[in-house]
Amino acid sequence: MGSSGSMVKPISGFLAALIQYPVPVVESRADIDKQIKQIIKTIHSTKAGYPGLELIVFPEYSTQGLNTKKWTTEEFLCTVPGPETDLFAEACKESEVYGVFSLMERNPDGGEPYNTAIIIDPQGEMILKYRKLNPWVPVEPWKAGDLGLPVCDGPGGSKLAVCICHDGMFPEVAREAAYKGANVLIRISGYSTQVSEQWMLTNRSNAWQNLMYTLSVNLAGYDGVFYYFGEGQVCNFDGTTLVQGHRNPWEIVTAEVYPELADQARLGWGLENNIYNLGSRGYVATPGGVKENPYTFVKDLAEGKYKVPWEDEIKVKDGTIYGYPVKKTIHS
């Protein structure tokens, strides 16, 4: 188990740890229970090694793995909140940390399941629940999230939001988090190596475009099919990379994060204060700036009419290429 980054809690701000969790090979419910125990063990051991730790983050699919033949079956799904989250909550309370966890969630309405992330605070309370807005189609069968992009209070003056893997490829997701007040965006991922460069690029651009920190971590290792790149990354609000992990399973990437600095930039910057400037265009020439929306795609998306000019020619619009029958209920 290696480590990169800081070791001590800052006087202001907070110390975060991103766990490059080894991609789980999961064949049964017993394997899931094993991962839960391992995650809990990792919480306690990481806190022991970093006594000032306040936030620990586990990547997407760290609890239930990526067994695509079974991942939507009743045996593999969890209820959120439920027994699994209760165990995570107990561990967070015992170690006095905020924890970010990944769960494939049973749909309470009986439909297709959700890809869900939660944040638990040091009192053992679930303070944020997020369902992935943009499943990685056509590979993933999850239902698109219906909880929006919530924001919660975190350590060291932070306002936290979580996005999941493919979500981070959409600048609109990061902007939504910032627009709702987040100064730290956490991204948990289960990508294979084919998109590692794009993953790092978007972590930086999401930080820069919104003047917020991004804390991102991916699964690491080989599952017999794909290699997962790890590469935990902490980006400053100016888009620069503060800490970058490697491709090692079990590497712990730590960083001191200062949310107040992001807040100060949002209040004090003129040039490149783009999250404000978006809604106040040309405020030198027009006092207060132009407020009207000039963007066709924003209007069309809001009206449920979003359609790219080449949409009728797009070849892949369902999951049949990955064996998902059209209109078949995948929850069993």
Swiss-Prot record:
InterPro entries (UniProt xref): Aliph_Amidase/BUP, C-N_Hydrolase, C-N_Hydrolase_sf, Formamidase
Assigned EC number: 3.5.1.49
One Gene Ontology term from the biological process aspect of the record: putrescine biosynthetic process from arginine
Keyword tags: Hydrolase
Stored Gene3D superfamilies: Carbon-nitrogen hydrolase
Active-site residues from the entry: E60 (proton acceptor), K132 (proton donor), C165 (nucleophile)
Homology family: Belongs to the carbon-nitrogen hydrolase superfamily. Aliphatic amidase family.
PANTHER family: FORMAMIDASE (PTHR43674:SF15), NITRILASE C965.09-RELATED (PTHR43674)
Name recorded for this polypeptide: Formamidase
